[in-house]
Design a protein with these regions (language model features):
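Conserved, structured core segments of small domains
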Residues: 1-133
Length: 133
């Protein structure tokens, strides 16, 4: 695990149905905690960008660019939103992710370092540099 990323860390929120079994008061309480969490990160200068995602979407795949419906909101793997954080280490990003108010209700948070360059582009650049040497 690479401990630092100068490009930040992405928190991907998965499990878009975490609130379905809760009362409206419980959802209101958790969202109040979520908004306080977000404000604290913003005020501390750690939040670069954030957004929820709509449930509907499409997937484009294959050589022909086939389009299909999905991902499906019912899926535990569906991404419901993201935070882009400006923090120096994976450890700090993980600590922030652990503070997510909806974790106890089944939401999961994937933490990924943002790469400085697409791995395929890096490989192509290195191959080009090697061939010129």
């Amino acid at each position: 695990m690479k401990p630092t990323s100068s490009n930040g860390y992405l928190l991907l929120f998965r499990g878009t149905n975490w609130h379905r079994e809760l009362t409206s008061n419980e959802v209101t309480q958790i969202m109040s905690e979520w908004n306080q969490w977000f404000e604290r990160l913003s005020n501390d200068g750690k939040m670069v960008a954030a957004s929820p995602l709509e449930n509907e979407g499409h997937i484009v795949s294959g050589k022909a660019g086939a389009v299909s419906d999905g991902p499906f909101a019912e899926s535990k793997e569906a991404i419901g939103g993201f935070f882009l954080l400006n923090v120096p280490t994976m450890e700090e990003a993980l600590e922030i992710a652990k503070q997510c108010p909806a974790l106890p209700q089944g939401l999961t948070v994937e933490v990924r370092p943002v790469a400085p360059m697409c791995p395929a582009n890096r490989m192509a650049s290195e191959a080009k540099a090697t061939s010129l040497a």
